[in-house]
Amino acid sequence: MRSEPVGRSGHSAGPGLQSVLAHVAAAGVALLSALLAFPASAFTVFACEPEWAALTRVLVPSARVHVATHVGQDPHHIEARPALIAQLRAANLVVCTGASLESGWLPVLQDRAGNPRARDVFFAADHVELIDPQPGAIGTPWAGDVHAEGNPHLHLDPRRLLQVSRALGERLGKELPAERLAIEQRSRAFEAAWRQHLADWERRAAPLRGRRIAAQHTTFGYLWHWLGVQPLADLEPKPGMSPTPGHLQRLLEGLRASPPAAVVIASYQDPRPGRWLTGQLSTAAAGARVPLLTLPATVPETAGEKELVLWMEGLVRELLQGLR
């Protein structure tokens, strides 16, 4: 006859107690796995955008990386949530874009986190030449998202992304001197592989040069600059301001005679203005359909090197298919 397990009181441990014990054991295993994956001493990075989180993972795979934003968000406008404050408080290094992209929310997080290390931010924009600088420009609620330093969306140029990866590797090597040689090796390996992809993307994207598009915001400005695509119009009346009926009507009148090859928006933007404009332009173009292309402006939050490559590959592929 099978005996039941006996507890300290001498009573049998029934199925209910066995189930509880099983759940407790499973939870303990899960917690132990998490602790092993990220030791208490793990170097912690707070990345303002997913692209910098991905580069950090390429260079220091053992780092614990927190990401403030995701592909479905406009990085200009982020709420200073308690979870972000806690993550910034624990950070050994903060990696952001700069060029005032995070000026509306990062200082608030820094003030509330009270972490001196969070003040010495690695800003990607400090390590590349920015396009479209506007010296003396000041962003106001009436002027929109104006960046005096230049367009902050620099990660959409794979050449500049490579420059940032090199500079970030140097900074991480200083932060982690014991791992400096390993970081340098990973940086060189990433650069070699990325350059191979870059040559392939540029060769395949050659037909895009000179193609004309309308877009919402300057999110993809570096992509157009790299590929030689010509932006004709912006759906926003002012940078960062939502498209208005009056502005869209003026765009329609200006583009009707010679429609663009496509209208392009980021995946976090409202598709309705672009949908209306492409519908009107397609009607005006006597049967020639003007497509609305919705592109991801960055990688997933958990991305690494593979996802960076797939993301850039996807952008080139979508443009080749959409701008025929």
Language model features with spans:
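Short amphipathic alpha-helical segments with coiled-coil-like heptad repeat character
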Residues: R2-E4, E191-A192
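Extracytoplasmic metal-acquisition and chelation regions
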Residues: A42-R324
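N-terminal signal peptide c-region/cleavage motif recognized by signal peptidases
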Residues: A37-P39
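Bacterial N-terminal signal peptides that target proteins for export
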Residues: S3-G28
